[in-house]
From Swiss-Prot:
The keyword Isomerase does not apply. One of its GO terms (biological process) is translation. It comes from Naumovozyma castellii (Yeast). This is Small ribosomal subunit protein uS3m. One of its GO terms (molecular function) is structural constituent of ribosome.
Length: 326
């Protein structure tokens, strides 16, 4: 009788172990199927949902409206401080190089802010209009200055980082990125065009200048680079890591394929009607009138649009820039 009971218990234990092993294998298979389905979903998409920080100018956590308003006010104040810092560098540069002071110009985009619980990240792009040796020397000094700003040592208690930290009670990290080409950022390209003489933008010399700014495309090299990047992602298995921006950085927004510039306004007080000029090149030239993609209510995944309004002594004008990347 005892032997029969022991056999039954052993059989029950074996059955339980078999059931547990079967459930474990089923769970593993389900997890693998879910990960594969998610990967295929992202692969068939335009990859925009993978990059959570593709385009942002302000990221903050909000728990009440007063905190949001205070942060917006602090952001405007820090914008002015950063602009003054860049102006001081350029004024110092112009005093040391009087002959080229009319040619030196720093174009800076609006800084981007990322608020965290105990930290604030500030990032902005800038472009130097004149790349002579004197300007490069002083921009290297600016790099050293920015490293000083990010240093938390007690020796630099009076630096700008600590001064700005006193207003918001957070550690501040400032990251400045120099652009070698004006078309790398839509805001900087728009400001660059606004500094030019508007009356000469429709001339052939200006068109040649804009065409020379754009890189020469080689379709075979672009295709081979994309294929190599995709093969590298497969070999390194980065495609399973959806939390990072590796796929977006490797496959998108690497090559400028076209640009469009829209000029509209009255540059003479005696004019009764507004003039309108459209300059385009590259991939935007063929699709301008066929699909009418220039309207702001249709912004594709690889199109970046920015416009700027200005009033001067000759009248009012608007510049709208559209850049297309792949």
């Amino acid at each position: 009788m005892k032997l029969n009971i022991l056999k039954l218990l052993n059989n029950n234990n074996n059955k339980n172990m078999l059931l547990k092993n079967m459930l474990l294998k089923m769970n593993i298979n389900n997890n693998n199927m879910n990960t594969n389905n998610n990967n295929m979903k992202y692969m068939n998409n335009k990859l925009q949902s993978i990059n959570n920080m593709n385009n942002w100018s302000l990221q903050m956590y909000n728990y009440n409206k007063n905190n949001e308003l205070n942060m917006m006010m602090m952001m405007n104040m820090m914008n002015k401080l950063l602009y003054k810092l860049m102006n001081m560098i350029m004024i110092n540069n112009m005093t040391m190089n009087v002959n080229n002071k009319n040619n030196n110009n720093i174009i800076m985009m609006k800084p981007m802010y990322q608020y965290m619980m105990n930290k604030l990240n500030i990032k902005f792009y800038y472009y130097i209009n004149n790349n002579n040796m004197n300007t490069n020397y002083y921009m290297n000094m600016l790099y050293k200055l920015m490293n000083t700003l990010n240093n938390n040592n007690n020796m630099y208690m009076n630096n700008m980082n600590n001064i700005m930290s006193m207003y918001i009670n957070k550690n501040i990290n400032i990251e400045m990125i120099k652009l070698n080409y004006v078309y790398n950022n839509k805001d900087i390209m728009n400001k660059y065009l606004s500094t030019m003489d508007i009356d000469t933008l429709n001339n052939n010399s200006t068109m040649n200048l804009l065409n020379n700014m754009m890189t020469k495309m080689n379709n075979n090299n672009i295709i081979m680079n994309y294929m190599n990047n995709m093969n590298n992602m497969r070999n390194n298995k980065y495609i399973n890591n959806m939390s990072s921006n590796y796929i977006m950085n490797m496959l998108m927004y690497k090559y400028l394929t076209g640009w469009t510039i829209l000029l509209k306004g009255r540059l003479n007080k005696n004019m009764t009607r507004t003039n309108k000029y459209i300059l385009y090149n590259g991939s935007n030239k063929m699709n301008m009138y066929m699909k009418n993609n220039y309207k702001l209510n249709y912004i594709s995944n690889n199109h970046f649009i920015n416009n700027i309004n200005n009033v001067n002594k000759n009248g009012k004008y608007n510049i709208k820039v559209k850049l297309s990347y792949i």
